């Protein structure tokens, strides 16, 4: 195995574990899925990150998706500098909130009204409460391997960190909450029809990642997503597209524009904060007007819509154009095709997926359509190759259940270097 000096990161991690559970504030950062200690990052610029040992990496994690303009984008940083000089938070309305709401509405017209929050978890949790209050029903439908944050109702059969650690749900989630969460395999059209035939009049909503991003990148099929739209309409349930990850990532106008399906509600996050803590949920006006203070379904948040997160979102989205997504898609296509070609040269079983700026690779040559397919992939090979990639200056997600991303700052040269790093990793792993 190639050598990488991470002495300072190892010391920092040992110290962190004295004061924080597992030494981190989000479990996937701990590198447990790849059998080693995490890198501690000093700074980032454009498509690169630099650890505290001085190692430089081409970054495809990008803070788990938000940094579509790369690290420390000059315009975003300049706008944040101006905003923070005025004050970090007021607990009162600001012009930035309305400005970002208008930008989101223009790009994603299905979001007629929006409520800003501080995380993706808060966005999905609040959207579920709104759906239950609006329909006067309790049960919700989610899909195995889809991750919608860590609120209790949505931790059943989830992806992301739960998948990384092999956990089905979490201790502390009451059985009665799990009872009201109905689960179906992702992309299982027959399963969806059967579930709604049996429970349709009890279901408040179905929440789905239209492109799953928390078990690697797995697109929802057109038939699957259209079936969801049809059965929710038939039974008076709401359809929620969780685009916290895929929004402004899979496509400029969201996955809903790719599949030509309009959900009742959409959840957002990540990119719309430009790297600051943020989330949002929105949709049809007649539904959203039930949120307090316009209606009686409660939501509040001390830092919801805070001026720094709003500025981060505005200064990010105002720079992006549909043409940027065409260019990024070309680069991801070249990258994933190059990785697959390198894998084939060494007889490494591999399937690659990408949608827009999101991409992932699976150490399995069989079709990957759901969570069970992902779990059948070669974890040991993933682990070996991960460390080889790091040693060659490429930072990818430290779990086969997570998504990688690209930014506007990644260059053709970065793509070539990354493919070469994968080639070297496959060579080392197959010796």
Swiss-Prot record:
InterPro entries: 4pyrrol_synth_GluAld_NH2Trfase, Aminotrans_3, Aminotrans_3_PPA_site, PyrdxlP-dep_Trfase, PyrdxlP-dep_Trfase_major, PyrdxlP-dep_Trfase_small. It comes from the Bacteria. The modification N6-(pyridoxal phosphate)lysine is found at residue 270. Pfam families: Aminotran_3. It is found in: Cytoplasm. Its cofactor is pyridoxal 5'-phosphate. The keyword Cytoplasm applies. It catalyses: (S)-4-amino-5-oxopentanoate = 5-aminolevulinate. Signal peptide: none annotated. Transmembrane segments: none annotated. GO terms for molecular function: glutamate-1-semialdehyde 2,1-aminomutase activity; pyridoxal phosphate binding; transaminase activity. GO terms for biological process: protoporphyrinogen IX biosynthetic process. It is an enzyme of class 5 (isomerase). One of its GO terms (cellular component) is cytoplasm. Keywords: Cytoplasm, Isomerase, Porphyrin biosynthesis, Pyridoxal phosphate. Its EC number is 5.4.3.8. Pathway: Porphyrin-containing compound metabolism; protoporphyrin-IX biosynthesis; 5-aminolevulinate from L-glutamyl-tRNA(Glu): step 2/2. PROSITE patterns: AA_TRANSFER_CLASS_3. Homodimer. Belongs to the class-III pyridoxal-phosphate-dependent aminotransferase family. HemL subfamily. This is Glutamate-1-semialdehyde 2,1-aminomutase. It comes from Limosilactobacillus reuteri (strain DSM 20016). The lineage of its organism: Bacteria, Bacillati, Bacillota, Bacilli, Lactobacillales.
């Amino acid at each position: 195995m190639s050598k990488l000096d991470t002495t300072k990161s190892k010391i920092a991690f040992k110290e962190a574990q004295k004061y924080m559970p597992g030494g981190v504030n989000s479990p996937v950062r701990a590198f447990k899925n790849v059998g080693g200690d995490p890198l501690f990052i000093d700074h980032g610029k454009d498509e690169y990150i630099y650890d505290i040992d001085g190692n430089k990496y081409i970054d495809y994690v990008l803070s788990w998706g938000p940094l579509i303009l790369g690290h420390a984008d000059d315009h975003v940083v300049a706008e944040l500098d101006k905003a923070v000089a005025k004050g970090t938070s007021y607990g009162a309305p600001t012009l930035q909130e309305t400005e970002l709401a208008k930008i989101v509405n223009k790009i994603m017209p299905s979001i007629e009204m929006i409520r800003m929050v501080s995380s993706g978890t808060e966005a999905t949790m609040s959207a579920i409460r709104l759906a239950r209050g609006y329909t006067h029903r309790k049960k919700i439908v989610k899909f195995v391997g889809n991750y919608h944050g860590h609120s209790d109702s949505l931790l059943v059969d989830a992806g992301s960190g739960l998948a990384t650690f092999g956990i089905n749900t979490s201790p502390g989630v009451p059985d009665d909450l799990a009872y009201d969460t109905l689960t179906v395999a992702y992309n299982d059209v027959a399963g969806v029809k059967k579930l709604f035939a049996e429970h349709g009049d009890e279901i408040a909503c179905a929440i789905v990642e239209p492109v799953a991003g928390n078990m690697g990148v797995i697109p929802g099929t057109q038939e699957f997503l259209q079936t969801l739209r049809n059965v929710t309409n038939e039974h008076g349930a709401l359809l929620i597209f969780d685009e916290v990850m895929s929004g402004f990532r899979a496509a400029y106008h969201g996955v809903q524009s790719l599949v030509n399906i309009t959900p009742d509600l959409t959840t957002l996050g990540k990119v719309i904060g430009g790297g600051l803590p943020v989330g949002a949920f929105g949709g049809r006006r007649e539904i959203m007007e039930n949120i307090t203070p316009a209606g009686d379904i409660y939501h509040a948040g001390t830092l919801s819509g805070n001026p720094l997160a709003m500025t981060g979102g505005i200064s990010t989205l105002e720079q992006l154009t549909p043409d940027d997504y065409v260019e990024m898609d070309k680069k991801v296509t070249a990258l994933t095709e190059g990785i697959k070609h390198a894998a084939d040269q060494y007889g490494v079983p591999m399937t690659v997926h990408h949608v827009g700026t999101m991409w992932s690779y699976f150490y399995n040559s069989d079709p990957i359509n759901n969570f069970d397919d992902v779990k059948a992939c070669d974890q040991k090979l993933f682990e070996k190759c991960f460390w080889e990639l790091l040693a060659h200056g490429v930072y990818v997600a430290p779990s086969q259940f997570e998504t990688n991303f690209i930014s506007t700052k990644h260059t053709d040269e970065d793509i070539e270097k990354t493919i070469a790093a994968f080639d070297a990793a496959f060579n080392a792993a197959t010796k």
